Amino acid sequence: MARAVLVPSAPTLAPASRRRRNARRPRRASHATCVNAASYEKTWSNPSGTVMDVIEERKDSSVFACARPFVWNDIDVGGRMGVVKMRDGSLWIHSPIELDDATRTEVDALGPVKFVVSPNYEHVKYAKQWKEAYPNATLYGCPGLKAKTAGVIPYDVDLGDVPGTCPEEWNGEFQCEHFDSETTPLIGTPFFNEVVFHHIPTATLFITDLVWTYPANSVGGVDVPFGTKVWKALMDKLYLPVYLNLMVTKKTRFAESVGKVAFEWRWSTLVPCHGTVERGERARRIVRDHLERS
């Protein structure tokens, strides 16, 4: 996925007392539920217009997401940051988005930010901003990213240096899989070099650019723009076959990774960076079908 720019419009905030109350007691629903009344302009990528949505809520941990327009060549390809409130109350951030005032208010209301993760080579734009805002948090990069961005982004840990790519300090709450099976043509280096994460307590899968779930026509009462429809068609019909058949050069290794993520791991909610949150067997089928086209 090419780098793009997050462009949220200025949110309208609810009274602070209501924001704090609702942030402490997020509601659970079959679909994402807003944490508070703060809002952005409604777009297909954020049809509720909310700053943060509740995705999963369990007794001892929860998952939230912040969806924003993600504009590439005037096309909104959608962007979503995942937030996990871990069992100890600390926060794990997946693929950080721009940390504007409204987003920071919501994040800070949930708990202390302890871990921030850039899951692949592309989703790095706001990593430095988050590290500066939360200097005590550990900033993780996918394998090779720390060296790749040396002097630009201050990554603390390269997940390639961590056995199994899952740090001990995550207290066994995650399963991690590094898709180290691709090569960029003519260059010979990895393309995404993505790590996929499963938060076990909430049965939630976080995936970045390996799988997308773009809606065909509308979502949440908001029509999908023509440009986004064209983007979806190009990604589905042109890019994905090229990626799976040409760029994935280690077929056996790729199949092993797909086997773990799509079949072995016991997740039920899919939180993609690009597209809609999906649940249940439909979500698992999307991942299987997407990654088994080769």
Give the positions of each predicted feature.
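Short, hydrophobic/aromatic-rich segments at coil-to-beta transitions
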Residues: 60-66, 92, 172-176
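Active-site metal-binding loops of divalent metal-dependent hydrolases
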Residues: 68-70, 96-98, 121, 144-145, ...
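Pre-active-site segment of Zn-dependent metallo-hydrolases
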Residues: 71-115
